[in-house]
Swiss-Prot record:
Signal peptide region: none
Alphabetized Pfam families for the sequence: NusB
GO molecular function: RNA binding
GO CC term, one of those recorded: cytosol
Protein name in UniProt: Transcription antitermination protein NusB
Record-stated family: Belongs to the NusB family.
GO terms of biological process kind: DNA-templated transcription termination; transcription antitermination
Gene3D superfamilies reported for this sequence: NusB-like
Name of the gene encoding the protein in the UniProt record: nusB
Function (record text): Involved in transcription antitermination. Required for transcription of ribosomal RNA (rRNA) genes. Binds specifically to the boxA antiterminator sequence of the ribosomal RNA (rrn) operons.
Keyword Phosphoprotein appears in the UniProt entry: no
Keywords on record: RNA-binding, Transcription, Transcription antitermination, Transcription regulation
Amino acid sequence: MTKRFQHSRRDLRERAFQALFTMEMGGDFLLASQFAYDYDKEVADDKQPSELPVFLLNLVNGVMDHKAELDEVIKKNLKAGWSIERLTVVDKTMLRLGLFEMTLFEETPDRVALNEIIEIAKKYSDDTSAKFINGLLSQFVSDESAAVTD
């Protein structure tokens, strides 16, 4: 039987970022997702893996399935003189995750996804990167999402 833990969506987004980052560095999808989810849970002593939440798997699978498409959108929205290869792996991973959740994952309102990825950026990067990510992704906030929060 697998263990179940309750996590907030913010925690799961952070775990998705960690898994995607690990995969970008050459890690395996399931192992990266499982490790990111189980990290800090002391399940190593239990020998039973935790059941991965659907939200986490949907984010990781979605970004990986649409990686080329997401990269094209990011490339088109970078300022002149910048290339996606010039971005740090952390920033590139956060941009992919945020862009996926805002444009292709209909469960989350755009502004919520944007705010969440900015908070993760502040934790794993610096203020300059968080502002850069905010600037690039904020143009994808839909008019409908803006109308709800205004």
